[in-house]
């Protein structure tokens, strides 16, 4: 049996876990459907949206609370944005449309590490920004600490603009109110793998084909890893990352921690039978020597080690791995279905914005959010995004010869002067099969998946660190111990259930007050 190098693995995990969650939580600032921020921002086009005049849900003409929508407060044409990047440059196409609507963005800069501290200071000093981005700790942590403004009075969630996101918006219900307006669904955590390596080793089982045939289950996943690991002692089945067991627990139809906003409850499911069963399954895989507990970047994890699968957020993980191995067939599949689940449950993530408490220009913030959402559902922009994501080659908009920019990134030569355009070497083309999975993992209206969001990383940093890494001595790693090191989940559960409860109790008290 192979022994995991635990000390090194724990050190690397401690260094990487926070950045891993941050990278997944906001992989791209632009409201795009593309998987690579450097290549295609599908919904960031300057294409005019034909519905922008008809679907408005923030102009005071609708009603999600009995039709009593009121006009949002405004103090002019300037949107004060607090962030660790500048929307004017990083979300330029959206800002251009925002400018066309008569608004402008003023950036209040902060670092990602000081983000919540700065926000709290500004709110407390009555100098609130008008809009901030969503982070995993925005809900329930930020909402519980009164950092945001409820948007129920100003937005019609049943409008054409927002109805497609209504269920997702409801996921973030807090005491009957809605503070977070996600405008897009992001594909969650997937398993990336190297099909070329499988072919080279003569393994005939194809995870992608198993998924397409409806046979991609925990059992099928374990079987192919067993076959792979039997090749040699230095072969591993899977490399966990900062998400560790979370997406696998979700596949059972249960989340580790559930915030039931309408009923003002925070539920700790550590003792749930599904959580127990999943953790025991992952612990068994680790104890059979299938788990590579040493974190490696997605650009090298499949090519530099003999690891078959790696657990990453789709946007960053697959694009990085494929871009670094152009001569190999890097693919991805969803987290396998739990054999005993009644549906194919999958983890998901969203992106959008919130309005801080005390904001003076809520109207401008809602206009920005509306533009983002309209871009997200524009059929022309969706088609454009697909064309770019599946294109063999992509090119930078600005011609290196004449300087003219061309919106179509798939054209090899500049339409104005005929010169060759500069190719984007970071681009990796998705096959039609992979693009279909990518689309399915964003489509909450489809019956292919049942989407669940685990609230476990939305509380304090200390709780997140404990779930991922354990305490200061590395003990109590609830999500990582069984999966990475084969630890007994029963022992972890019995020893640390009370500790997790102590982290949750203050949030329960705050929820009852709000």
Regions found by a protein language model. Give the residues of each.
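Conserved N-terminal structural module of periplasmic/extracytoplasmic solute-binding proteins
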Residues: 4, 9-11, 22-140, 376-388, ...
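Hinge/lid segment of periplasmic solute-binding proteins
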Residues: 63-70, 134-188, 219, 333
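Extracytoplasmic/periplasmic solute-binding protein
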Residues: 132, 174-185, 189-191, 214-266
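Short, solvent-exposed loop/beta-turn-alpha elements that line the ligand-binding surface or hinge
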Residues: 152-164, 210-214, 254-277, 337-344
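Glycine-centered hinge/linker elements that transmit conformational signals in sensory
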Residues: 223-225, 260-295
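Extracytoplasmic/periplasmic substrate-recognition and gating elements
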Residues: 323-395
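Short cysteine-rich clusters marking metal-coordination/redox-active sites
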Residues: 399-402, 414-417
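Cys/His-rich microdomains that often coordinate metals
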Residues: 404-406, 421
